[in-house]
């Protein structure tokens, strides 16, 4: 048994839905359900959960008879497939779990059964937690900040996915499965690094270029993008032409959102959240890259501070000499040699201390000397 490309999906993906659009192709003649099937939660870790037309057509009615589809359960998981073998349908029964935590029984056969057995084997594998963590890490890199709680909310439904495949007991080749799991984890880790590089480098370059264009436009026209309507043509005929060209591609697009319509460059909520995320990622990368250098510089500064700070008992001797010689605080070489013997410091340290001490007391000495000269002048004037 080999894990081909069709089975490389994560185990949290639900089984594919089958929609019979052709009237000539009829659905399987029998539906073996022990009870009326109910709606199931959205695909696990499948963030875009917009309800499509095909999903609404396949959604079963509620138990109260209402045919409306619940907004919170956009997809109905159908464990029903057909496998014809000599005119008979070969089926197996597995358990499923609906949104209310109740168990439902469905019929699975053929390729659906094989795919479900692969997913069950992956769920029971020891590396499944590591695989799921790598998959979620890739999602968190490229997901906007305001959408991250949706990932956590879907992770809380992990027990329902495990319960859904718990009844399958198909044995898979362990060596082949180990090889698949290990290579898939390595692939996801590499993909995460590529996503981080894209978010930190390419996306930031695009945002910066967009900001520069915005500033250039404002400097040339004097109008900020938020004040304008994003239109570059003033004639109604030209405006209608732009709208018709946009509608040719997609009826849901308008001139403000289309690049060919030169819409406003005002960032959306997701773009702002992406910018914040890019800034945080860049700040984190810078901290990690320069962390060792910052620590070395800090240690060097602290070492110099510790080296420049003299012990308290030695400074007391120097301060005492300063007070006794405050009128002329310039020690001679003999005084310095005596201070070296008394304090145990080096001659360079004593010289630096006196230089700094004179700088600290420079203002006080100048003020006292000026007052002394004024007093002398007054005395000489009176005499």
Swiss-Prot record:
Ranges of Basic residues composition bias in the record: 374-383
Entry keyword DNA damage: no
Q: List, in alphabetical order, the Gene Ontology terms for molecular function in this entry.
A: DNA binding; DNA-binding transcription factor activity
Tell me, what's a Pfam family for it?
A: KNOX1
One GO biological process this protein is involved in is: cellular response to ethylene stimulus
Q: Which Gene3D superfamilies match?
A: Homeodomain-like (1.10.10.60)
| Annotated compartments | Nucleus
Q: Which PANTHER family match?
A: HOMEOBOX PROTEIN TRANSCRIPTION FACTORS
**What protein name does the entry list?**
Homeobox protein knotted-1-like 5
Organism this protein belongs to = Arabidopsis thaliana (Mouse-ear cress)
Taxonomic path: Eukaryota, Viridiplantae, Streptophyta, Embryophyta, Tracheophyta
């Amino acid at each position: 048994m080999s894990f081909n490309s069709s089975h490389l999906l994560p185990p949290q993906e639900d089984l594919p839905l089958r929609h019979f659009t052709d009237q000539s192709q009829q659905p399987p003649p029998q539906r073996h359900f022990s009870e009326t099937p109910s709606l199931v939660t959205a695909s696990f870790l499948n963030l875009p959960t917009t309800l499509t037309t095909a999903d609404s057509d396949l959604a079963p009615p509620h138990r109260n008879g209402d045919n409306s589809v619940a907004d919170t359960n956009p997809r109905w998981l159908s464990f029903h497939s057909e496998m014809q073998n000599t005119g008979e349908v070969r089926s197996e029964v597995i358990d499923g779990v609906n949104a209310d935590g109740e168990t439902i029984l469905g019929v699975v056969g053929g390729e659906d059964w094989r795919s479900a057995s692969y997913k069950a084997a992956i769920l029971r594998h020891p590396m499944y937690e590591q695989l799921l963590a790598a998959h979620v890490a890739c999602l968190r890199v490229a997901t906007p900040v305001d959408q991250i709680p949706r990932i956590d909310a879907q992770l809380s439904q992990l027990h329902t996915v495990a319960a859904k495949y718990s009844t399958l007991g198909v044995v898979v080749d362990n060596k082949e499965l180990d090889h698949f799991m290990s290579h898939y984890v390595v692939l996801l880790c590499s993909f995460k690094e590529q996503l981080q590089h894209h978010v930190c480098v390419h996306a930031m370059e695009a945002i910066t270029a967009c900001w520069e264009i915005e500033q250039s436009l404002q400097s040339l026209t004097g109008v900020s993008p938020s004040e304008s309507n994003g239109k570059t043509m003033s004639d109604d005929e030209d405006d209608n032409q732009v709208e018709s060209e946009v509608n040719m591609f997609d009826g849901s697009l308008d001139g403000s959102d289309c690049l060919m319509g030169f819409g406003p460059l005002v960032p959306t909520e997701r773009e702002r959240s992406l910018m914040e995320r890019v800034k945080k990622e860049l700040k984190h990368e810078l901290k990690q890259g320069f962390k060792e250098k910052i620590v070395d510089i800090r240690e060097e500064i602290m070492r110099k501070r510790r080296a420049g700070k003299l012990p308290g008992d030695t400074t007391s001797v120097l301060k005492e000499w300063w007070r006794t010689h405050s009128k002329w605080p310039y020690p001679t070489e003999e005084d310095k040699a005596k201070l070296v013997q008394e304090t145990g410091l080096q001659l360079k340290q004593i010289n630096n201390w006196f230089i700094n001490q004179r700088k600290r007391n420079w203002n006080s000495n100048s003020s006292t000397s000026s007052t002394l000269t004024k007093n002398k002048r007054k005395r000489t004037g009176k005499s």
